[in-house]
């Protein structure tokens, strides 16, 4: 599939450098803020994503957008060799400090790319990070490149609830979440960006189609929390 490509993050007027600064600013209170804003569901979503990935001991796993290492730790407990990457040095420093007891985690600071050889990993996990990439399909195709044939990809992202939940969800995103963020976050503006990026995100079938366009197969998805979050699972096709 060729060499790795650099995917610059440009979403809602923000470039990679701006997004890096934003995550550096929110890093210290990131986990606590997410727990409150998700009504204690954040940890549940992450566990569900890791369970769907189905990792076993000895596998090579890439955690994209590892952040403070919340999902990375869960994967590492399986005995897999985990590489956690992120664009924020502050996030990764917190992750390193919290995961010192894990000898099977390697941390790497990146610039929004996947700087790895072809067919490097058995599985890839992306939890709440794909929205921050401008060229979503290009990034997913690069993920296919670094996966081994038959390798698994799981994407956990915010989604769009349907039917009676949708209007209440929009009300929360536009009015409640920003006000809560002002009370508990070190950077409320970052959560305005969060709202915008969620509202502009793809429908579940649209993301599934992009995965298939990149050569992924057996694509499926699962909705969580009345559709506020969706998990996508796909396999890289054979050679």
Swiss-Prot record:
Pathway(s) where this gene product acts: Quinol/quinone metabolism; menaquinone biosynthesis; menaquinol from 1,4-dihydroxy-2-naphthoate: step 2/2
List of residues binding S-adenosyl-L-methionine: 68, 86, 111-112
Sorted UniProt keywords: Menaquinone biosynthesis, Methyltransferase, S-adenosyl-L-methionine, Transferase
Superkingdom field: Bacteria
EC number: 2.1.1.163
Biological role: Methyltransferase required for the conversion of demethylmenaquinol (DMKH2) to menaquinol (MKH2).
Name recorded for this polypeptide: Demethylmenaquinone methyltransferase
The organism of origin for this protein: Tropheryma whipplei (strain Twist) (Whipple's bacillus)
Name of the gene this protein is made from: menG
